Amino acid sequence: MIYGIGTDLVDPARIASSLERYGEQFARRVLADSEWPDYLEHIKPALFLAKRFAAKEAFSKATGTGLRAPVMFGNMAVQHDSQGKPYFEFQQELAEWIGQRGITRHHLSISDELTMVSAFVVLEK
C-alpha cells in the first residue's frame, strides 16, 4: 500500500548560486556525512548537490511532514546500488521514525537535464 508520494524540481543554477554565496557551509547543510567524499570528487558539484537536494525534498514531501525533525537532509543519504539505481540510507533516528509509521520500502528516481533536476519518491507501507 502506498504511504506517500513526493516530487521536487530544482534548477542547478540556483544551487550553483547558493554554493558561490555560502560555499562549503551550504553543501554541508544538504549532504549527509557519508555523501561528502562523493561530493568532493564530483566534477559538477552544483549538479551533485541539486540531485541530492531534489531527492531529499521529494522524500520529505512523501512523508507528509516536509523538512522537520527527524526528516532532515543530514539524516538521509542518496546512494546507488551496483546497477546505478538510487536509494536512500537513513540515520538511526530517521530509520526508527520510518519504522514507527510502518513504512517498509521506498523508491527513488532522479532525472536531470542541463537546466533542471527532478526527483520522485514513493513510500510503501
UniProtKB/Swiss-Prot annotation:
- What's an example GO cellular component term for this entry? cytoplasm
Biological processes, Gene Ontology terms: fatty acid biosynthetic process
Gene Ontology molecular functions: holo-[acyl-carrier-protein] synthase activity; magnesium ion binding
> Which cofactor does this sequence's record say it needs?
Mg(2+)
Residue sites binding Mg(2+) per the record = D8, E57
**Catalyses which reaction(s):** apo-[ACP] + CoA = holo-[ACP] + adenosine 3',5'-bisphosphate + H(+)
Q: Its domain of life?
A: Bacteria
Q: Where in the cell is it found?
A: Cytoplasm
Keyword set includes Cytoplasm: yes
Q: Which UniProt keywords apply?
A: Cytoplasm, Fatty acid biosynthesis, Fatty acid metabolism, Lipid biosynthesis, Lipid metabolism, Magnesium, Metal-binding, Transferase
Q: What does this protein do?
A: Transfers the 4'-phosphopantetheine moiety from coenzyme A to a Ser of acyl-carrier-protein.
Q: Which family does it belong to?
A: Belongs to the P-Pant transferase superfamily. AcpS family.
User: What name goes with this protein?
Assistant: Holo-[acyl-carrier-protein] synthase
Question: Which species does this protein come from?
Answer: Nitrosomonas europaea (strain ATCC 19718 / CIP 103999 / KCTC 2705 / NBRC 14298)
The root-end lineage is: Bacteria, Pseudomonadati, Pseudomonadota, Betaproteobacteria, Nitrosomonadales
